[in-house]
Amino acid sequence: LAEATGRADRFVGLHFFFHPAKNRLIEVIPAESSSQETVDKVVQYCKMLGKVVIVCSDRPGFVVNRFFVPWLNEACLLLQEGVASAAQIDAAACKAFRIGLGPFGLMNLTGPPIALHSTDYLAEQLATPRYDGAQNLRDLIEANAHWDISGDQDYTTEQYDVISERLFGVVFGVAAQIVEEGV
């Protein structure tokens, strides 16, 4: 894309997150040809928009989706294994990560097919099993359904420990991989 513009030194990719009017996070992805001046101006512009900026390399999933997608998938695996219900996993994830929306609520909001497409894309591009989409996510999409998160959100201490350890584990594992790759 940068070369097609005829001004490759002034080209930078931006990755906004859902919902861009509310989510303050943005990834800035310089091309190999991007000048430092261009990157600096784009970062400054994004900060003027009130965004929290992550500058990263042009790699599959950039930074955030590299750990966010397996985080969603790990939640699906926890459900598939019968560790807890979707509502309980969401509640435990919200507490552990101090966030307002759990993995199943988020997938319902953005659409489960987006989560599956992301897992399949990253699994193919990175050839890493942690990105292979969970079967229950595939089944949900086949049924053209959404996750049922209407149930009881109360979880046991044991459930919370398993959920939080598994979700943090996948995030930390991928974060280490990202650092190692220099993304």
Which stretches of residues belong to each language-model region?
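N-terminal glycine-rich phosphate-binding loop for ADP-containing cofactors
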Residues: L1-V183
